Design a protein with these regions (language model features):
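Short, surface-exposed amphipathic charged segments that create phosphate/polyanion-binding patches used
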Residues: 242-257, 405-411, 433-434, 497-503, ...
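Conserved RecA-like ASCE ATPase "motif II neighborhood" in helicase/translocase motors
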Residues: 259-316, 485-489, 502-524
Length: 586
């Protein structure tokens, strides 16, 4: 067997076995209500989002079974607004069994199937390599005017350089902080070249929210140029908000389930694939569906590449198709449920789930592919290797004022990041000294509850972000709506006008910026903000901390006025968070 193929398959086997042995990767979702509408079952589940392919059902004392047609079920849709999961029973006996055991009905999300999909994908492949074939625009013998590279005057020098490299080099990485133009400038212009050349490309992202964020940005830009939305096709299950706004770009197979009366649901997937030039999907959807799509892509674009596990990104290395990675490796790394302390000996293969897509070049420069190869002992923050990768850095951000950009550059980026002249609104609220208990800080929660109603009057785009799951639950007890609270990890891929940050405590892994993992996590929290950042903390404690990112924020921040009486804590407990919502339960 090919040594690379063997390494990839071993990684899948080792990681799957670890999750199975430690009962990880599978979470029970809280069932709040069950309603029968023969032959359909409507189940209200407390979860923000679901992967329909991961769902399993337990009826009575019988072991959980997949919610798929093989076992007599058909998942019609999941409406995240109403939190209703709609299932069709294909067999009356199955429906009777569910009705009989209604009170014992349980729903699980088992994400281990994604590993099985990866394994099946690699089993069918025999060629693995960094792409050598350049994009079509690099062919000097082309006489087509469409195949020339055009950089518009509005691009700055770094953006123009990145665009030229994307369209002429087989493997490239565009690194930039939020607001540097990775998506709305560089990616958009690159895709525009392919659209004008009538050439199909693929846009990928590690999560549904990240995919929809990039597609929304692109659709708005295409709309301004009067380019038909039918040029874009989003495969997989979209959020309700995305479907309502952009139904014409959604997967017709999904539309037929959720919006059967929609004009766009009458089109077949085959015809949509034929007419679309930009196909968007998650990397997991690519793994599962690529073989059945029967299409060829001229270029792969992987957004949020630093959050994408290396082993999933390696699926793109099987086609000798140009690859462009876009992202920011100074933010969150992939979520791996296997501790690195267990990745040794014959378990070292699993490190491919721990490292990010940015280690692709490193992976292919290994002298051998045994479990002792250097790639299997690297950490998420090991130096990146870019000898054959065309690296472009975007140092100018229009998201932040130069006041915040300088802080970010000093503590996190170290690459000369600079921002716009007008400063970012940075505020702090001193909640006085109150020692945190069990990763909860009542003083911070109480202050946030005081200002939250006022903030909501100014903008509905308000998020309260905290590193800790327990603090998020506490915020709910203080009457902060659950859909406005996020953990740092859960907020990845989201954007808000106003971000209120509750640090709770100085914690080595999540708020102590001397630890690079914590610094990158704090960068995520700050970068969710578009206009205003409010830090709620014990001012006297944090201002005394040396070389801390949050301390630097405090030095530049202004006091935020509080006028209302603090609300009292609610007595009821918040809904339990599933593993899908809060990925890292710290």
């Amino acid at each position: 067997m090919h040594t690379i193929k063997y390494a990839l398959l071993q990684a899948c086997k080792v990681y799957y076995a670890y999750l199975q042995e430690h009962s990880l990767g599978c979470e029970e979702l809280q069932v709040a209500q069950v309603v029968f509408d023969d032959p359909n079952i409507h189940i209200r589940i407390k979860a923000k989002m679901l992967n329909a392919d991961s769902l399993m059902i337990q009826i009575g004392s019988v072991a959980p079974i997949p919610l798929n047609e093989e076992f007599g079920f058909y998942v019609r849709f999941y409406d995240e607004k109403s939190q209703i999961l709609s299932i069709e029973c294909l067999d009356s006996s199955v429906l009777n069994a569910v009705q009989k055991h209604k009170s014992q009905l349980k729903i699980f999300s088992d994400l281990k199937f994604l590993i099985r999909n990866l394994e099946a994908f690699f089993e069918q492949q025999n060629t693995f390599a960094i792409p050598a074939a350049p994009p079509i625009f690099a062919h000097k013998d082309s006489t087509s005017a469409y195949r020339s590279i055009t950089t518009q005057p509005y691009l700055n020098k770094e953006q123009a350089s990145a665009l030229r490299d994307i369209l002429s080099k087989p493997f490239s990485y565009v690194w930039g902080a939020p607001g540097s133009g990775k998506t709305q400038v560089v990616l958009f212009e690159a895709l525009l070249h392919y659209v004008y050349n009538s050439t199909r490309v693929c846009v990928l992202a590690p999560t549904n929210s990240a995919l929809e964020q990039v597609l929304q940005s692109l659709i708005k830009k295409f709309d301004t140029l009067k380019i038909e939305r039918s040029m874009i096709l989003r495969l997989g299950t979209p959020s309700n908000a995305f479907m309502e706004q952009y139904a014409e770009v959604c997967d017709p197979q999904i539309l037929q389930k959720k919006q059967p009366q929609s004009l766009f649901s009458a089109t077949s997937l085959k015809s949509r694939l034929k007419e679309s030039l930009i196909i968007g999907m998650t990397i997991d959807a690519f793994v599962k569906r690529y073989a059945s799509l029967d299409v060829e892509f001229a270029h792969f674009f992987l957004d949020e590449c630093a959050f994408t596990p290396l082993i999933k990104a390696l699926t793109l290395s099987t086609q000798n198709t140009p690859i462009t990675l876009l992202g920011d490796h100074k933010q969150l790394m992939p979520i791996c449920e296997m501790s690195t302390s267990h990745m040794h000996g014959d378990k070292a293969w699993a490190n491919l789930f721990n490292l990010s897509a940015l280690f692709m070049e490193d992976f292919f420069t290994q002298e051998h592919f045994t479990s002792s190869a250097k790639i299997f002992i690297k950490s998420q923050v090991s130096p990146l290797q870019f000898t054959h990768t065309s690296l472009n850095i975007l140092r100018e951000t229009h998201r932040y004022g130069d006041n915040l950009a300088k802080i970010l550059d000093h503590h996190i980026y170290h690459n000369g990041l600079y921002g716009k002249d007008s400063p970012t609104d940075l505020f702090f609220i001193d909640c006085k000294s109150q020692p945190p208990q069990n990763k909860c800080n009542h003083a911070e929660a109480q202050v946030i509850a005081t200002i939250f109603p006022t903030l909501l009057k100014h903008s509905n785009s308000v998020a309260v972000i905290t590193p800790f799951v327990k603090q998020r639950k506490l915020l709910y007890e203080y009457q902060i709506p659950y859909n406005h609270t996020w953990t740092i990890h859960g907020s990845q891929g989201q954007e808000f006008e106003i971000v209120v940050f509750s640090p709770v405590m100085l914690h080595h892994h999540l708020t102590d910026s001397r630890n690079r993992h914590a610094a990158y996590a704090l960068n995520v929290a700050v970068s969710r903000m578009k206009k205003c950042f409010i830090l709620v903390c014990d001012y006297n404690y944090w201002i005394r901390q040396d070389e801390q990112f949050l301390t630097a924020i405090l030095h530049c921040a202004k006091p935020y006025p509080i006028t209302k009486t603090p609300p009292q804590k609610k007595q009821e407990y918040p809904p339990p968070t599933s593993h899908i919502i809060d990925i890292v339960p710290i």
